């Protein structure tokens, strides 16, 4: 399987508010940058969208290293998701899972890949994360009239 590194980030001006997402995909010497924005969203939805769009860009099953500064994404996919699914997309408190639409999409997109999830401290000089952050901010800026 091809090895791919994904750096992802989301940004939001207001929460909720205008948001953007960005991702950098690295496969050997090839790199691809992705970004986009949404007019009325949250920081967590943008963090998730960054990973979703990056995984959508993969055309075949890959071994993937995902780097995110979102503990919500990292813990959600690594720790919370199995329980949510077992409880019919309810939290341990029996409340509906927030962003269930995106979690379900992410759950589908991860299936063909072998993914290792990494949390990195945001705005701490990590080059891949800094690039993803800049792309997420471009996504926000793309919405400015």
Curated annotation (Swiss-Prot):
Its cofactor is Mg(2+). PROSITE patterns: RNASE_H_1 (PS50879). Mg(2+) 1 binds at residues 9, 47, 69. It catalyses: Endonucleolytic cleavage to 5'-phosphomonoester. The keyword Phosphoprotein does not apply. Pfam families: RNase_H. CDD domains: RNase_HI_prokaryote_like. Its EC number is 3.1.26.4. Keywords: Cytoplasm, Endonuclease, Hydrolase, Magnesium, Metal-binding, Nuclease. Belongs to the RNase H family. This is Ribonuclease H.
């Amino acid at each position: 399987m091809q090895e791919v590194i994904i750096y992802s980030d989301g940004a939001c001006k207001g929460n909720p508010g205008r948001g953007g997402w960005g991702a950098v995909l690295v496969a050997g010497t090839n790199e691809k940058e992705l970004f986009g924005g949404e007019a009325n969203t949250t920081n967590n939805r943008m963090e998730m969208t960054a990973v979703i769009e990056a995984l959508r860009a993969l055309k075949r099953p890959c071994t993937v290293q995902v780097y995110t500064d979102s503990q919500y994404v990292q813990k959600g996919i690594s720790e919370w998701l199995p329980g949510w699914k077992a409880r019919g997309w309810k939290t341990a408190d029996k409340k509906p899972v927030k962003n269930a639409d995106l979690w379900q999409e992410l759950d589908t997109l991860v299936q063909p890949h072998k993914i290792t999830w990494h949390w990195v401290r945001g705005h701490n000089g990590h080059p891949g994360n800094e690039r993803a952050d800049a792309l997420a901010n471009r996504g926000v800026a793309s919405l400015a009239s």
